[in-house]
Structures are given as C-alpha cells and as structure tokens.
Regions:
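General structural signal for secondary-structure boundaries
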Residues: 4, 13, 174-175, 246
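Extended, well-ordered protein cores
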Residues: 57-58, 62-202, 206
Length: 246
C-alpha cells in the first residue's frame, strides 16, 4: 500500500534503485529495491492520500516519478497525486519502446495509446503520434524527468532505444551525425531512429536520401553471417516503416 511505498522511499534516502533483480542480494539497496518492486497499491489507496504521505515524508514529485518508473504499478496513482497530466502516457511510451517483456496488464495500458502491437513496438516500431501527444501533454520539463527516470525500466540498457527515438523525433540529433554513427557502429537502434528525425527544407529529397541509405545498409549486410543478415534486414524494414510514419 501507499504507506509502505513511502516508507520504502524514505529508507532509500538519496540512494538509487537497483534495476537487476540478480543483484538485489542482501544489501540495504538490494532489499529495498526488492520491496519497492513488489509493493502494490491497495484498493483503498487514493491519490490524495499518496500526495499527503509524500508531502509529510518530504518525497519530491521527481522521486515519486523515479519510483513509479521502477515499479509501474504506481504510475497512474502517481500521476493523479502529483498532478502531472500525461505522466502515464509518457511513462508507458518508454516502457513500450524497450525490448523488455510485457505482462497482460501493461499490454492493456499500452493499447490505450497506440494501435501498434506491443511485440512490434518491442522490435522497434514507433508510434510518432503517441510520442508527440505524450510530449505535448506532459511538457518538455516534466518529460525530461521521465526521460531520465527511464533508466529504471530495465536491467539492461534497452531503455536507451526509447531515448534515441525521442531525441530523433524532437530533432535533438542531426541526420548527418546519426548516419555517421550508424556507419561506424552499425547500431540497429540508431538505424531505426534515423527515419524519425524531422525532414528539412527539401523533404522529398531528404526522404529519398534516407530511403537510399537504408537500402545501402541492407546491401552491406550481405558481407556478414546469416544470423546478422536477418537481424539487420529486420531492422531496415522497421526503419523504413518509421520513415513512412515521419
């Protein structure tokens, strides 16, 4: 319940949560991370009560968002408690665009915001309309808080894909710079984000240039083994779909 949730956050102090359950162990942070992950709202918990408890414990709105990203069962109640309209949508944008597994409850919530299948999202498909709506609703400053808290979603770095997609869609990166990185690293997440960067003054030319580059990337993949070829082919197909959505 909410009282336990807040007590756990008090016990954490300024310590960070441990994402990987294999590393929880018997340390203070490990035990508290395990407890936070397992803590669920009670049917009797209200947003008003959570707000009151957090205020009494001097837990900031930003810390509540971090905790809710780590333990997503608290996202919706947290949105109401702190009054951040659009938090649930923004938070689940990040959850949906990692390659972590989703339970039925999470799938149902994601389905409220996008018609794209959860498995396709996990593979790298991107709903640009969902992202833009979530970003506009929550606002740039609060979105940055969610963006930074996304590190608590997974035990790997799979949350970085959602960040790359966000940076691309917001024009925080340049197509030429991303292209250089793709050439240097053949990073599939960057490849899939490449088509999401806003088109410039000559959209038709840029669209063609990006399409041709994706085809070139696909052709180059024939230099590698069968498994890598298949993986890169899938990434190119998704990149083309994302380009078409731009």
């Amino acid at each position: 319940g909410a009282e336990t949730f807040i007590r756990i956050l008090q016990a954490f102090g300024k310590d960070t949560f441990i994402r990987d359950s294999y590393n929880w162990g018997s340390t203070k942070r490990g035990v508290l991370s395990s407890l936070l992950h397992a803590c669920h709202p009670l049917p009797t918990d209200t947003s008003e009560n959570l707000k009151k408890l957090a205020k009494q414990a001097e837990i900031s709105d930003e810390r509540l968002v971090e905790a809710a990203m780590f333990a997503p069962q608290w996202i919706e109640l947290t949105e109401k408690a702190i009054g951040w309209k659009g938090l649930t949508s923004a938070a689940y944008y990040f959850h949906a665009h990692t390659n972590e597994t989703c339970d039925d409850k999470k799938k149902a919530i994601i389905a409220r915001y996008t018609p794209i299948d959860v498995d396709d999202l996990r593979e790298g498909a991107f709903d640009i309309d969902w992202f833009k709506d979530a970003f506009k609703t929550i606002g740039k400053q609060r979105f940055e808080v969610v963006y930074n808290a996304a590190k608590y979603i997974s035990c790997s770095n799979s949350h970085t894909r959602a960040r790359k997609f966000a940076d691309a869609t917001n024009g925080a990166v340049k197509a030429a710079d991303i292209k250089k990185e793709i050439i240097a690293k053949r990073n599939k997440d960057l490849l899939m984000s490449y088509g999401l960067i806003p088109l410039g003054r000559k959209p038709d030319k840029e669209l063609l240039d990006r399409y041709q580059y994706l085809q070139k990337f696909l052709k180059e993949s024939k230099e590698f083994g069968a498994q890598r070829q298949e993986s890169e082919k899938k990434a190119v197909n998704i990149a083309l779909q994302n380009l078409a959505r731009n």
